Amino acid sequence: MTPTLNSRLRLGGSLATLALSSFVVPAIAQDQAAPVTTTTPSAVDQPPVADIVVTGSLIARPNNVAVSPIVTVSSELVQQSGQITLEDSLNQLPGFTPSGNAGTGGQGAGGRATLNLRGLGSNRNLVLLDGRRLPLSDINGNVDINILPESIIGSVDVITGGASAIYGSDAMSGVVNFKTDRYFDGVRVDIQNGDSFRGDYGKFNASLALGTKFAGDRGRLMLALSYGKRDPLSGSQRDFFADKVPSSFIGTGAFVPDALNLPSQAALNGVFAQYGVTTPINRTLNLGFNNNGSLFAQTGAINYQGPTSDGYAVVGGNVRMPVGPQLQILNAFERKSAFAKGEFDLTESLTAYGQFLYVDSTVTTESGGSLTQFAPFTTIPVTNPHIPTDLRTLLASRADPTAPFRWSGRYVGIGDKGWDENYRVQQYLGGLKGTISGSWKFDAFVSYDETIHSQSMFNAVLKSRVQTLLNAADGGASLCAGGFNPFGITNATSLSQECQNYMTATVQSRERLAQTQAQGQVNGALFDLPAGPVQLALLAGYRKNTYKYDPSPDLVSNNVESVVGSNPARGEISVKEFAAQIDVPLLSDTPFFHELGVGAAFRYSDYNPTGSVKSYEFDARWQPVQALLIRGSYQRAVRAPNIGELFSPVTGSQLAIGTPPAAIGDPCDIRSTARTGINGAQVRGLCLAQGIPAAAIDAYQFATTATGGNIQGNNALTPEKANTFNVGFVFNPKFSTPWLSGFSFSVDYYNIKIRNVISTINGLTVLAKCYNLDGSNSGYSNSNEFCQLIQRDPTGQLVAIAQPYLNLGALDTDGVDVQVNWSLKLSDAGIGDGSGKIYASSAIGWLNHYKVQTLPGTASQDFVGTSTPGRPLPKWKALTTVGYSSDVFGVGLRWRYQGKLRDISAVTSPAAEQVGVKPYNLFDIFSTLDINDNLQLRGGITNLFDKGIPFVASSQNGTDPGTYDMVGRSFYVGAKFKF
């Protein structure tokens, strides 16, 4: 954290203000900029509007009734959450599952943030701005919502149901439509500061918005500038991470025996006898190096002489290096953005409009020291002068005593590896809209956007340079001062600066995505029925996306430690579309039929290269009385494979599998429940078939806690298809008694069934299914499709698990959303003579099922109520707000609730189920104070009771930073000016 930011926060901390509540409201009605209200708005309560737009429909219905379940989030709700990024505010709602965000992304995330409706994936919901697609932020079709300056947002509409027939591919789980604020005259300034109560996580945000009307109000213009900054939070700043991520890649270095060229048992016993060890040592296991040159068995910590602090520990009897303190839990983040939109009435019936968006964001991510994880592995020749005497004895006892040996370790003498990422987005849009004749209107636009992601990896250890030093007859001393001695922690940390410079480099890569869009739409009334006009909308569009990836030569040659190599890649997809929607009012203003109507929509999309698809929708609405709306819809939704799924290069990452039997680990490990269980003989046979040498099979232990996971595109993919069903009601009774006049609630049931799912297979799932931990491979056959994804080296060690994109099985989920609102004007109830009111609002989500069928014909597994890293699926989730507000002051309390969760291992490997997570509750307080008509102060405290970080057993870092609060109790203060 910079001193400047610290000083700003200390000064700002003297403001004792908190934020006015606003509401998440289910919509019977939606208008272009829904006001903050405490009740469900209805068509009767709002005056007629000439040009109504309803999110989720191509038709502007005169009665302003929304058939799709829609939740509207006001801009005030975003502000009172105390966050400086939009996704942190929206992810508090039950319908969202925390996904990638600007703080928790690792390599390649670029400070980007995505939204994930229903836990179905961030690329299965569509994110729009004023009903139009936003620039893509990555090759997987995701949209970074943090490219939107908060100062331009008037409200957010969230459709929690399929909408492919209306909006096209990607709208399987729903749509999030950000609506820009209405045009205005004047200047608006907003500033907000915040920090943790520990003073180690500063956040700052400022925005400036200018609006003007000109040429006799025929022209309207809005300009917004925004700046946001957030400090990093490392694992060393939270005690929770002190012992987390116990890595088997340790700073002392380790000798990795070759199963086909093992040291003799006699030599090994003799060396350890010198240390007073009489128990035979498993000669297939890694041996580490003490500072005095003696050896220790990493498994069992036999003869380990320390250290046992400063990042070293004995975990489960094994020597490990907890790297949790080295990890950057929340990234540093800086964003600058500019947005402009304007329109000009050329005639009374024709308006030209344009829009511009520019974003420049930078994030720095650090991930700890580099390690020797991915092939090709580092080897050391027997001629290296630094080899300790006892190790030389073992090397000489091998069948081939002159063969080089593999060295495993972590480069603790070099600074932590990290990434400086810059992410720039530009979008240009222009169009015409107007009236054709009567009720018939048109809107046509073209747009172009470009996203450039530049990445600089610093302190990248080059394998070729390390190998050159180790191969040198003098240990590399002639190449850099002192050379490289990797044996023992003291030697490893004594690396000269000259050698550090020799071994490392800054490695560059660059991604470019571009999108071109053209779309035209007409809509109007075909004819009138007694209940109202029959309306039709027609749409035609074209969209093209291109992608290009240029990696550094060191990445192409797989020359960077801890990083899987990647090749240049490029790809292109395009689509031509036609859509139609019709709305038919059947009855109105009759007994039991205040309104009855039906609608339908159809979309034809022709994708290059994956072919044509069709989607459609049928919906119905019935208001038996004015206060009650019953609604339902059925949709066939589609999602075509995106550029990343089709063309992405191999992308590798570390896949944590843990150490058996406490975790799944390598099932071939003799300590695993797979080997020790009733089917141990069958598992042993499968492990032999996979290449573990017979000489090593009965002593085989996987020495590390992680392996590689390699994701790659697949241009043979076909589109996903989904059937979605929604039914529910909204009740807004308008009781005459003041205690109930502000009461409303809604209940909606959703059911989504996706087939031909495009996805990668989780590496832990691959292991569980290959080794029949869940019954998927009862024959223990190595030809099983999951076993074919497992890669082992000639010694049998688990090198990587391939995770290509595939058309897999199915994904089925269903649940219920409930929204309850209540408010009371105190003066109406005879309490006081002021204009204040009290209110309560609760959004509740209940998840019934979340079933995943990995492959067609296989059994489904229900993950409801499980703690899946990056995708928690609680059965219950709720956001509840209570408070008081008046014309000048407001104060409230917010309760965020997430139900208990089982660990994912309860489903994937029940025999090795790990501990789950208890119910999680967070409380926030907030308030506003209006000094005058032009100045408002706000502030609040989040995580009021300083709730600690929960342990997530199956997560690589021991928790889920995207779901749980890593910071602890925090405060924010802000001010809004207008003039």
What are these regions (language model features)?
Residues V598, G742-S905:
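Gram-negative outer-membrane beta-barrel transporters
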Residues G162, R182, N193-F197, F214-G216, ...:
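Transmembrane beta-strands of outer-membrane beta-barrel pores
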Residues R755, N848-K851, W895-V907, T928-F979:
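C-terminal beta-signal and adjacent terminal beta-strands/loops
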Residues S456-F458, L462-S464, Q635, S648, ...:
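C-terminal beta-signal and terminal closure region of outer-membrane beta-barrel proteins
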Residues Q46, Y183-G186, G199, A215-R218, ...:
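Short loop/turn motifs that connect adjacent beta-strands in outer-membrane beta-barrel proteins
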Residues T2-S81, E87-L93, S207, G211-T212, ...:
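N-terminal Sec signal peptide and the immediately downstream disordered periplasmic leader
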Residues T451, F458-L462, V466, A569-G658, ...:
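Structural signature of Gram-negative outer-membrane beta-barrels, strongest in the C-terminal barrel
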Residues D88-P94, P98-R112, R132, L136-S151, ...:
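Surface-exposed beta-strand-turn/loop segments characteristic
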